[in-house]
Amino acid sequence: MKRKILIIADNCDVTKSVAKNIAAVFGAAPFANWSAAVVSAKDFPPTKLLSANAFLLGCEKPEPPEFTDIKVLFTHINLVGRPCGVFSPQANAIKYLSGLVRDSEAVLGNPLVVTKGAVDSRKLKKWVGGIIGGKA
């Protein structure tokens, strides 16, 4: 059975694009035993998080309106030991996302600072490997 990673992003073009690029690295070596699902933070069903073995969060700016419910959820849910990563084009958004998951006790990996345009798949594989384990 494949392990699941959930990628939650705001509606910004940059973060949506990066989320899709991240999802594309799953299903093939070295992450062939993983499947990825990308969901909009706006339409995020909290039950999806419970079935995920790991999760990633991305937004362009701190406190986007789409993350209001997620912020509440993460103050009440226990995700102790679950691998987590955050990505954004802005350092202050990474700080926001990192703080968001703190109370959940998820294991936060190194953040990914993204720029406009495509992100190199080798860089994404290395980043993901650092979060969920595995070499890329």
Per-region residue spans from a language model:
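FMN-binding flavodoxin-like domain, especially the glycine-rich phosphate-binding loop
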Residues: K2-I8, N21-A41, P46-A136
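Short N-terminal binding/cap micro-motifs at the start of the first secondary-structure element
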Residues: V14-V18
